[in-house]
């Protein structure tokens, strides 16, 4: 499944508007002294838009994916202009410098880090077909390298995973980072993720799916874990692991979540949960045996969740529109 041209046009329109919109802005910034002239664009010249830093990163990823799939989009030239400005050597140097500041070692760890790596993976995939994508990838490389190294240190240090359905999920971060590691040829990162995933999740059995979702989830802790294990385990080993992890099937994970208020920034996460469940299930299905009776059921549930979340990806309140289209793009296919 791919993003059709009509959807891509709408997604591009929303992403362009968001990545260039400086306010409103949710700053995650530790002050070590008087703030001075603290504006989003001055602090983060590449990723100042889309409400917060990580959303700005993954909406840039969305733009790259869209022009990769549809080079003739009506907004293609506007996308190139924005990427030229935001993914410049100078802008990325400032983003790198930010991580050297006092108390910033954990800034956007691991979610924002992983999205930078996935953005770089998408640029590298496109670079073989477009010279400007090579230029953008070259500019982003110092930040991607820095965050890949920091992620390696983090996952080596961590004796336990973070098993929640929000930004700090280690499984989600590792899925995106693994894609980057494979595309960029970062064998150390790939190996570290494989080791960590086995350590954290390899013995997991009977996932507590009855406890999902939490009210602000945009990821399923169980499904994103299964999706990561699908990426790192050999097929037969994964199939055996999945039997033990979901011995009674999907249970309540098969039902799209109820979203009580799409103008509430936390509750709007639940539309993202529908989209990320669809993404995870579609990836998991590709590893099931051809005669596995779960294939049709998992696919139908993925379709149900996509139908629940996709209509809300663009055109709604800003608390959803500044990020949801990225997750719709994940659900609609392709790497990672």
Predicted stretch roles:
Residues 231-268, 272, 277:
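A beta-strand-loop signature enriched in Asp, Gly, Thr, and Trp
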Residues 150-223:
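Loop-centered beta-sheet repeat module
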Residues 1-3, 60-73, 114-132, 173-185, ...:
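Well-ordered alpha-helical scaffold segments within catalytic/enzyme domains
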Residues 258-336:
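Fungal-biased detection of long, low-complexity, Ser/Thr-
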Residues 4-15, 74-90, 129-154, 186-204, ...:
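Extended, well-ordered alpha-helical scaffold segments
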Residues 1-48, 92:
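Low-complexity, Ser/Thr/Pro/Gly-enriched N-terminal "stalk/linker" regions
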